[in-house]
Amino acid sequence: AFAGVLADADIKAALAGCAAADSFNYKTFFKACGLFFAIIDQDHSGFIEEEELKLFLQTFSAGARALSDAETKTFLAAGDVDGDGMIGVDEFAA
């Protein structure tokens, strides 16, 4: 999904940086990847839901790990400004 957008080496480096459980840093992600909302929003609902967050690393590479439940909940809470359990495009870009 990211062909032509990111170099393979950059994708590998980003995945290696969060390969261990509970090592994902949502602040870094929001800062670096604001452009990728539409790709992470796999069902094209206009929102990123919990399951899409849990599995979003696999968008970069099929062999990537799923986020832990704790990482997913922290990530969702950080981006879900209005408390509806989803991250809308306006929240994602904020």
Curated annotation (Swiss-Prot):
Modified residues (N-acetylalanine): 1
Domain called EF-hand: residue spans: 36-63, 67-94
Residues where Ca(2+) 2 binds: 80, 82, 84, 86, 91
Transmembrane regions listed in the UniProt entry: none
KW Acetylation (keyword) present: yes
Gene3D superfamilies: EF-hand (1.10.238.10)
Binding site for Ca(2+) 1: 41, 43, 45, 47, 49, 52
Source organism superkingdom: Eukaryota
InterPro entries referenced in this protein's UniProt entry, alphabetically: EF-hand-dom_pair, EF_Hand_1_Ca_BS, EF_hand_dom, Parvalbumin
Disulfide bonds: none
UniProt KW keywords: Acetylation, Allergen, Calcium, Metal-binding, Muscle protein, Repeat
GO CC, one annotated term: cytoplasm
GO molecular-function term, one example from the UniProt record: calcium ion binding
Protein family per UniProt: Belongs to the parvalbumin family.
Protein name: Parvalbumin beta 4
The organism of origin for this protein: Merluccius bilinearis
